[in-house]
Amino acid sequence: LTLELGELVSEATGQQSLSLTLTNRTEIGCFLYGYPGVSLLDSSGRLLPLNYRWSGDQMITSNKPTHVDVRPRSAAYVTINKYRCDLGNVAHATLLRVIPPDDTNRLELELPADSRSLDYCGTGDPGSDLHISPVEPTFPATLLH
């Protein structure tokens, strides 16, 4: 699997979402079931101490995980979301790590400058909760409907 940025998300006020695409680059199909492990790191490689939550919110679906078949050269989707930092950022995310469900290999993606809003706001700030969708067969399925 490879990790890439997905489609742009039409966000509610104050929300900062990032959609992700997990593409099967092999000639053999596979399946995914569950939530990916997600972590955001700063430019020094330090883990941002966000509250990483496998749950829905104002943008992310609350649906339970389903079995997702990923055919050769096809993709599965994940979206992450957090609220903005109203009182300022404590640390900036520059790297995203994803571990697909039932896997131990991590996939990494450098975050473009315009997605650096995925920052750590500080202890107790509502913007320090990062919500993670389950793996879904389509991008729209990762979002709250």
Q: Model segments located where?
A:
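Asparagine-centered strand-capping/turn motif at beta-strand->loop junctions
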Residues: 20-27
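Short, surface-exposed ligand- or partner-binding patches at beta-edge/loop junctions that are enriched
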Residues: 84-112
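Short, solvent-exposed loop/turn segments enriched in Ser/Thr/Gly
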Residues: 12-19, 91-93
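The feature marks short-to-medium sequence segments in extracytoplasmic or secretory-pathway proteins
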Residues: 32-72
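Acidic, serine/threonine- and proline-rich intrinsically disordered appendage/tail regions
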Residues: 108-145
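Low-complexity, acidic Ser/Thr/Pro/Gly-rich terminal tails and inter-domain linkers that flank the onset
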Residues: 1-12
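Short, solvent-exposed, Trp/other aromatic-anchored flexible loops in extracytoplasmic proteins
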Residues: 58-93
